[in-house]
Amino acid sequence: MKPALLEVMRMNRICRMVLATCFGSFILVIFYFQSMLHPVMRRNPFGVDICCRKGSRSPLQELYNPIQLELSNTAILHQMRRDQVTDTCRANSAMSRKRRVLTPNDLKHLVVDEDHELIYCYVPKVACTNWKRLMMVLSGRGKYSDPMEIPANEAHVSANLKTLNQYSIPEINHRLKSYMKFLFVREPFERLVSAYRNKFTQKYNTSFHKRYGTKIIRRQRKNATQEALRKGDDVKFEEFVAYLIDPHTQREEPFNEHWQTVYSLCHPCHIHYDLVGKYETLEEDSNYVLQLAGVSGYLKFPTYAKSTRTTDEMTTEFFQNISAEHQTQLYEVYKLDFLMFNYSVPNYLKLD
């Protein structure tokens, strides 16, 4: 074959390769611009097609760098609440920062939602069942799209929620820095009475009666009957208070989470919470969190039954038979929660 013919054939092959490369590049460019104009859609747990969060504003950006220049009254209120926590921690540094370093085990109450970059510290007796339901739906962990379809007992199954202590130390630090962290609090003594009513006056809570009721009666009741010592199902509120202020109680083991202080459960002097919601403004504060997370268009905080809730009037009645000495000692136990979350000393207290 002549050299000239070979050269022509070689040039033809090169041209075909160049054309194929150009065509492939052209196709890739088309796909790229299509993906930019029409981002990948995913099915979210609410059954609504929404664009993936990547590239959108995070809850932290919505909170600290709002699009509107003037802060809303709600944003100002939450700034004041954050400042109150900070000021209390500084003023009571010796008491509030006894532990300088947190361990992963201290973070088991912090529930993580990766999709919306949220961390929620749950506090028992402060609407935590409904907030756990919401976190299950938000994170897509489970088969439910409606929070109120989730049975209460299922909301408390640990496998249904991912908590911060399950991550590595670098992953924990990254999420604490980058995610919006929030918690909900309640007037401390109202929360305490709510815990007592739920755990010690309901006959179905036999596990609490056995675990704590028998111990409280054994320590605090003189001449207790054998039946009371065996069942532990008739603990009086006065006995419960005496158990809480007994120094031996916390030396033996930490408080149960239902009556543990908020600062011990959520460590607000070590972890900077971006939002502090209150039980007294539960629906407004909850829906504000959902707004910042970008889901308020199709998800609202579930309404709750007010008929069974513990009120200030009920709390006042429960404290009528508590001596001034015991009231003072109990206030000291929960003092940081009162100060940190700006709750006044109750009028019914007879402090020494």
UniProtKB/Swiss-Prot annotation:
Amino acids binding 3'-phosphoadenylyl sulfate: 124-130, 186-194
Membrane-side (Lumenal) residue stretches: 38-352
Role: Catalyzes the transfer of sulfate to position 4 of the N-acetylgalactosamine (GalNAc) residue of chondroitin. Chondroitin sulfate constitutes the predominant proteoglycan present in cartilage and is distributed on the surfaces of many cells and extracellular matrices. Can also sulfate Gal residues in desulfated dermatan sulfate. Preferentially sulfates in GlcA->GalNAc unit than in IdoA->GalNAc unit. Does not form 4, 6-di-O-sulfated GalNAc when chondroitin sulfate C is used as an acceptor.
The species this protein was found in: Mus musculus
Post-translational changes noted in the entry: N-glycosylated; required for activity and stability.
Transmembrane annotation, as ranges: 17-37
Upper classification of the organism: Eukaryota, Metazoa, Chordata, Craniata, Vertebrata
Swiss-Prot/TrEMBL keywords: Carbohydrate metabolism, Glycoprotein, Golgi apparatus, Membrane, Signal-anchor, Transferase, Transmembrane, Transmembrane helix
Conditions for induction: By BMP2, suggesting it is a target of BMP signaling.
EC number: 2.8.2.5
Reaction equation(s) it catalyzes: chondroitin beta-D-glucuronate + n 3'-phosphoadenylyl sulfate = chondroitin 4'-sulfate + n adenosine 3',5'-bisphosphate + n H(+)
UniProt membrane topology term: Single-pass type II membrane protein
Name of the protein in its database record: Carbohydrate sulfotransferase 11
GO molecular function, one term: chondroitin 4-sulfotransferase activity
